[in-house]
Amino acid sequence: VKSLVGRVRAGLRELFALPEGYEVLLGNGGTTAFWDAATAGIVRERGLHLSYGEFSSKFASATKKAPFLADPIVVEAPAGDAPDPLTSGQTGADVITWAHNETSTGVMVPVARPAGLDDGTLVLIDATSGAGGLPVQIADADVYYFAPQKGFASDGGLWLALASPAALERIAQVDADRPTVGATRWIPEFLSLTTALDNSTKDQTYNTPAVATLFMLADQIEWMLANGGLDGMVARTTASSSHLYGWAQAGAVTTPYVSDPAKRSLVVGTIDFDDSVDAGAIAATLRANGIVDTEPYRKLGRNQLRVAMFPATDPSDVQALTACIDYILEQNA
């Protein structure tokens, strides 16, 4: 296990060209566990959260429920859009958070450190479905966290975080001081980022992880490095997404759901269909023929398909998918 964790940490350090002083942390539980860990161990008093979909709203929900934190500041945008983090640097928060890619809607938001942040405000980026397939300069984030089951073609149940020196200092301070604006702050050992850091630097985890998950993750990272690194992966997702959105714009009954081209994700594409076409029936036909998981996010409730375009997906597969959809449309015309 230590050898596998070491391969993962070394590979991520190279893939993301980590600046001096950054550390790779990991632990069990996936991104959901990390939201709770960050709530308990990084946010001192109040968080500022950009909320624009099912998953970007969950961190805000976690900090709102914490009895030892002040209510978060939440900047919202409707589904299919996103707030601009560069203009959202309100005062009064010691962390600002947003999702690099909102998985439910296919909206991506670049990682850039907002100007005018209060001194000591940390930038936390949820890259659960964006890491490995979207461009990023890690120095623009204090914590860039994700899980293996999207861009890294592994299984879930594990979280990984690339943490800056400022974030590491905050973790130590919160653990030592236990700041509170209400009830006493309790940090369960399972959610302790101090414990996660201590174990990660020894190439291990606090709880034994699934070895298969680590093996697939390490192997995928090394494949990424052998095929052009992060730039090579972004080239693949760009090719896939350019084809998908170009196809949708050219179609008579299809439209990219995200109206702003700059916010259309390179890794999760959402395509709306005209009311004359039942997108659910198309997804069912695809599934019956072995092409699975093109259904939209269930809570969005739109007549659309959602297409994964992570680095492991060959761009030619996206081209084949749109050809299959065209065939279904022709047969039902």
Regions found by a protein language model. Name each.
Residues 138-149, 159:
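Conserved active-site segment immediately N-terminal to the catalytic lysine
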Residues 299, 303-333:
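PLP-dependent enzyme catalytic core of the Aspartate aminotransferase-like
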Residues 77-132, 143, 151:
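Active-site phosphate-binding strand-loop segment of PLP-dependent enzymes
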Residues 255-285:
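Conserved PLP-binding catalytic core of the aspartate aminotransferase-like
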Residues 1-37, 61-62:
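Conserved N-terminal alpha-helix of the aminotransferase class I/II PLP-enzyme fold
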Residues 152-238, 242-245:
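Active-site C-terminal subdomain of aminotransferase-like
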Residues 33-94:
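PLP-dependent aminotransferase-like
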